[in-house]
Amino acid sequence: MISHTDHQLTLIKENIKFIPNYPKQGILFRDITALLENPHAYSACIKLLADHYKNHQLTKIVGVEARGFLFGSPLALILKLGFIPARKAGRLPRNTISESYVLEYGTGCLEMHNDSIIPGDRVLIVDDLLATGGTIKAVVKLIRRLGGEVYHAAFVIDLEKLGGKLLLEKIGVHPYSLVIFSD
């Protein structure tokens, strides 16, 4: 018999589309827009993440631009936590700190308001996908520079062969993913 959780995970997997050669040649993009269009699949993601983290004594959630906002914001509401956006450079109005990083298919820079984390905050990072881990490593650096503690990061998808999980574990962050693709 299939458990309710297994049914939810199957629903999530069925709503992730594969787009070859996007955003550039040689990349197999995992598209979550169909998942977002299906309220049952989207809700299943949020519920499973909330169930996993409800007893972790967190104080804040940081969502990574832009798709991390889609999962981090509703998760923060359910867990009754503050939500902090980690945004691309130049998009936040107050004083910020920044960190550069390397993507699977380029480079980037993320910023956070320099007063959004207070020393001792226990922070969960949320994004849609874990690839190489470079983006999340940059967010971890930002949070730790502000005095926050970060030991957990949540994802809908983990592209296992790209090594992000291993990178995060090396810096003391435990990744949790709903769906793991090993291809």
Curated annotation (Swiss-Prot):
* Any GO BP: purine ribonucleoside salvage
UniProt-listed CDD domains? PRTases_typeI
Query: Which keywords, in A-to-Z order, does the entry hold?
Result: Cytoplasm, Glycosyltransferase, Purine salvage, Transferase
Task: Name where it mostly resides.
Answer: cytoplasm
Q: Does the keyword Manganese apply?
A: no
Q: Which InterPro entries match?
A: Ade_phspho_trans, Adenine_PRTase, PRibTrfase_dom, PRTase-like
Example of a GO cellular component annotation carried by this entry: cytosol
Pathway, according to UniProt?
Purine metabolism; AMP biosynthesis via salvage pathway; AMP from adenine: step 1/1
Enzyme Commission number(s): 2.4.2.7
Entry-linked PROSITE patterns? PUR_PYR_PR_TRANSFER
GO terms for MF: adenine phosphoribosyltransferase activity
Reactions catalysed: AMP + diphosphate = 5-phospho-alpha-D-ribose 1-diphosphate + adenine
Where, subcellularly, is it found?
Cytoplasm
Q: Which domain of life is it from?
A: Bacteria
**The protein's enzyme class:** transferase
| Pfam families noted in UniProt | Pribosyltran
Q: Does the keyword Lipoprotein apply?
A: no
Described function:
Catalyzes a salvage reaction resulting in the formation of AMP, that is energically less costly than de novo synthesis.
Query: How does the annotation summarize its subunit structure?
Result: Homodimer.
Please give the NCBIfam families that the UniProt record associates with this protein. apt, PRK02304.1-1, PRK02304.1-3, PRK02304.1-5
Stated family:
Belongs to the purine/pyrimidine phosphoribosyltransferase family.
Q: What name appears for this protein in its UniProt entry?
A: Adenine phosphoribosyltransferase
Species of provenance: Blochmanniella floridana
Gene that produces this protein: apt
